[in-house]
Amino acid sequence: MLNFVGLIGTNSKESNNRRLLQFMQKHFAEKAAIELVEIDNIPLFNKPAKMKVPEVVSELAKKIEAADGVIIATPEYDHSIPAVLQNALAWLSYGIFPMVNKPVMI
């Protein structure tokens, strides 16, 4: 069975993107395990000295590294992604690179 991390790319509790990931998790359960991950608890990116990454980001990176792929469900705000997702991606590319050579579906 394949294992995926499903990033909920918004902090809205009523998001259609959240519902989409929940639908995928339920309806593809026999073929893949999809762990839904909230990103609204990640601190604002601030480029800290010594490239110290917050523990919550390190934990997320470990989940991504262990997964077979990543599914990002995100709304589009003003022709871009939400700030909460941009923030998470900034941390996930600051000295750690868990998504390199990892299949990602948006």
List where the protein language model places each region.
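N-terminal beta1-alpha1 ligand-phosphate binding loop
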Residues: 2-31
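Short, glycine/serine-rich, charged loops/turns that create anion-binding
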Residues: 9-12, 41, 96
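Secondary-structure boundary/capping motif
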Residues: 13-16, 45, 80-81
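Short beta-strand elements in bilobed, periplasmic/extracellular small-molecule ligand-binding domains
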Residues: 31-41
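N-terminal beta-loop-helix "entrance" segment that forms/cooperates
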Residues: 39-55
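Helix-loop-strand module that forms the ligand-binding subsite of alpha/beta enzymes
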Residues: 53-106
